[in-house]
């Protein structure tokens, strides 16, 4: 059997963000704090929406799904980083690496699809308010979420199967803090043109189509707001989209910076900085972005916290 095949590499080494011990300790602390904030913040959002009947609407249904996906997204990478630091190890098995890559891609795709679905919800609410309840039915909302899961898993399974066929020879060091597609393609000693072609074609379609839907939705929303006679009324309508727009810019800005450049132009430091933004920082910020200027959400969160920590008389 040839020595230059897939079985010659049984594990990869995740080099992480830094090799300096002091920086590693600081990064461990930062990642731990951000991960705890991500889990706590998003679970509070889910709990608040589930316990407050006023929030049982399509917008908050999609938001609770986004919060669930964000917890899963962050949990795909950060716990492994923390565990490796505690154990003093950099290793991840070949199968573990592909598994991590698969779930990272699935949850990333789900973020993408849910942001598009949420923009459609805002489009219907602002542009067709009288037909909102008849258009955004519970059946449609469930169908949109389930359909997103199906498409995300099918898309990611295709890319993982293409990745699994590659051969990895002597070099098994990944200059990243998790298993990502671009570093793995660079390590492969096989022809990766098909993988790169699929990322830039099929992968781009899956990523760009929801983004185009978001743009179209906001063009219609902007036109509808500009037609409102009262500036105050128009601003109030558009302000409900502000949180969603902030998350869209944060998510797509970092993803495009990493995944839609030629592989030869990728710089490890820049890619990792962008990866920290979309895989760690964005899931942490989403609960704050969606709740800071939302009075209904803040009231629901106060209610949940009051139930958990009742004030002493």
From Swiss-Prot:
Q: How does it sit in the membrane?
A: Multi-pass membrane protein
Is ATP-binding one of the keywords?
no
Give the principal location in a single coarse category.
Answer: membrane
| Keywords, comma-separated and alphabetical | Cell membrane, Disulfide bond, G-protein coupled receptor, Glycoprotein, Membrane, Olfaction, Receptor, Sensory transduction, Transducer, Transmembrane, Transmembrane helix
**Glycans attached where?**
5
> TM spans, by residue?
26-50, 58-79, 101-120, 140-158, 197-219, 237-260, 273-292
Q: Disulfide pairs?
A: 97-189
Question: What's one GO BP annotation on this UniProt entry?
Answer: signal transduction
User: What's the protein called, per UniProt?
Assistant: Olfactory receptor 1f45
């Amino acid at each position: 059997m040839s020595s230059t095949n897939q079985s010659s590499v049984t594990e990869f080494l995740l080099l992480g963000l830094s090799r300096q011990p002091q920086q590693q300790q600081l990064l461990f602390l930062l990642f731990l704090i951000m991960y705890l904030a991500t889990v706590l913040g998003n679970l509070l959002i889910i709990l608040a929406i589930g316990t407050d009947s006023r929030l049982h609407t399509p917008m908050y249904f999609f938001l609770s799904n986004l919060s669930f996906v964000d917890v899963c997204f962050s949990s795909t990478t950060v716990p492994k980083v923390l565990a490796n630091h505690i154990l003093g190890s950099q290793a991840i098995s070949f199968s573990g690496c592909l598994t991590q890559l698969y779930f990272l891609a699935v949850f990333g795709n789900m973020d993408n699809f849910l942001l598009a679905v949420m923009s459609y919800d805002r489009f219907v609410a602002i542009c067709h308010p009288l037909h909102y309840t008849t258009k955004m039915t519970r059946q449609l909302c469930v169908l949109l979420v389930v359909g997103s899961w199906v498409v995300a898993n099918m898309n990611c399974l295709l890319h993982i199967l293409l990745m699994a066929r590659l051969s990895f020879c002597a070099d098994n060091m990944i200059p990243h803090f998790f298993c990502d597609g671009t570093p793995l393609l660079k390590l492969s000693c096989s022809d990766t043109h098909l993988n790169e072609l699929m990322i830039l074609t099929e992968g781009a379609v899956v990523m760009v189509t929801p983004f185009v839907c978001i743009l179209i939705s906001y063009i219609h929303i902007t036109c509808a707001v500009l037609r409102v006679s009262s500036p105050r009324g128009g601003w109030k309508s558009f302000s409900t989209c502000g949180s969603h727009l902030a998350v869209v810019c944060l998510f797509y800005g970092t993803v495009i910076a990493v995944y839609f450049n030629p592989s030869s132009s990728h710089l490890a430091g820049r890619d990792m900085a962008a990866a920290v933004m979309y895989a760690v920082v964005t899931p942490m910020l989403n609960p704050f972005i969606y709740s800071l200027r939302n009075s209904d959400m803040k009231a629901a969160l106060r209610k949940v916290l009051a139930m958990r920590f009742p004030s002493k008389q």
